[in-house]
C-alpha cells in the first residue's frame, strides 16, 4: 500500500512539473463565442500540432448509457452535411428516419418490437449509405498533409488532434469547425463494433485493471 501511495505521489509531481514547464511561452486567447485558444509557438518546427479539447467525457454520461462519450468521439469522424455527403438532400430523409427509429427503440422494452425497429434501422442505413461516404474526412485531412489523426476520451475531456503544415492552418480550422458545428452520425450501428473491439482490447491490458482498481478506491461514489 505504501509503495502504491508513493507511486501515485510521483505521478502527480511529474504531471505538475510538466504543466509548469509547458506554461512558458504559452499565450491564451478568449474568443467572442467563448472558445479558449491556447497558442504555443515554436518557429523551429515546420508543422503545427492542433488539439481541439472539449470539457466533457465519461463522467458526464447518463448511468444507463455508459460508453456514450467514447462513442460520440468516434462518430465525429463520420463527416458533416458537407464533408462525406454525396447528396445531402437525398441522404437527409433517411438520416432523420434513423434518428426517429432510434428514439422509438429507446422508449420500448418489448424485444419483438426492438427487433422490428432494428430491421428498419438497417434498411434505412443501407439507403442513406448510397448518398454518402465516411472516408471524406480522412481524405481531406490527408490532402492538407495532416499526420497522426486521432482522438481520445477521458473522464472529463474529449480531445481531437493531429499535425499539419503551418501553411494549411485555415483549411484545418475550416474542417475541424465544420465537424463540431454540423456533424452527421453516419454508420451509427457499424461503429458500435469498433468501440467494443477497443473495449475488449483494453480488458487485456494489465495497467487498465490497475488504474480502474486504484480509481475505484480513490474516487469511491464518484463518476471517476
Describe the predicted segments one by one.
Residues 65, 152-155, 191, 206:
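Short, glycine-/polar-rich solvent-exposed loops and beta-turns at beta-strand/coil boundaries
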Residues 194-213:
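Short acidic/His-enriched helical or mixed secondary-structure segments at domain edges of catalytic enzymes
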Residues 5-7, 18-134, 159-166, 170-177, ...:
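His/Glu-rich zincin catalytic helix
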Residues 30-32, 39-41, 144-154:
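Catalytic zinc-binding patch centered on the HExxH motif and its immediate surroundings
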Residues 219-224:
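Gly-rich Lys/Arg/Thr-decorated short loops/hinges at beta-loop-alpha junctions or inter-strand turns
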Residues 89-92, 184-200:
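Acidic/histidine-enriched alpha-helical segments
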Residues 2-10, 14:
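Sec-dependent signal peptide recognition
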Amino acid at each position: 500500500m505504501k509503495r502504491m501511495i508513493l507511486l501515485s505521489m510521483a505521478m502527480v509531481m511529474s504531471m505538475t512539473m510538466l504543466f509548469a514547464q509547458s506554461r512558458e511561452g504559452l499565450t491564451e486567447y478568449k474568443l467572442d463565442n467563448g472558445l479558449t485558444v491556447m497558442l504555443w509557438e515554436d518557429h523551429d518546427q515546420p508543422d503545427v500540432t492542433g488539439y481541439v479539447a472539449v470539457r466533457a467525457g465519461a463522467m458526464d454520461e447518463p448511468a444507463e448509457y455508459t460508453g456514450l462519450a467514447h462513442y460520440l468521439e468516434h462518430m465525429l469522424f463520420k463527416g458533416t452535411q458537407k464533408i462525406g455527403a454525396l447528396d445531402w438532400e437525398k441522404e437527409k430523409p433517411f438520416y432523420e428516419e434513423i434518428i426517429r427509429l432510434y428514439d422509438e427503440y429507446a422508449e420500448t422494452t418489448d424485444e419483438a418490437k426492438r427487433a422490428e425497429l432494428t430491421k428498419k434501422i438497417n434498411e434505412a442505413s443501407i439507403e442513406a449509405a448510397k448518398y454518402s461516404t465516411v472516408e471524406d474526412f480522412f481524405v481531406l485531412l490527408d490532402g492538407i498533409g495532416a499526420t497522426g489523426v486521432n482522438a481520445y476520451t477521458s473522464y472529463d475531456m474529449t480531445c481531437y488532434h493531429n499535425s499539419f503544415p503551418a501553411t494549411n492552418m485555415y483549411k484545418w480550422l475550416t474542417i475541424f469547425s465544420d465537424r463540431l458545428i454540423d456533424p452527421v452520425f453516419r454508420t451509427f450501428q457499424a461503429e458500435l463494433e469498433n468501440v467494443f473491439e477497443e473495449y475488449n482490447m483494453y480488458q487485456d491490458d494489465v495497467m487498465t485493471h490497475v488504474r480502474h482498481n486504484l480509481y475505484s478506491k480513490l474516487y469511491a461514489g464518484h463518476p471517476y
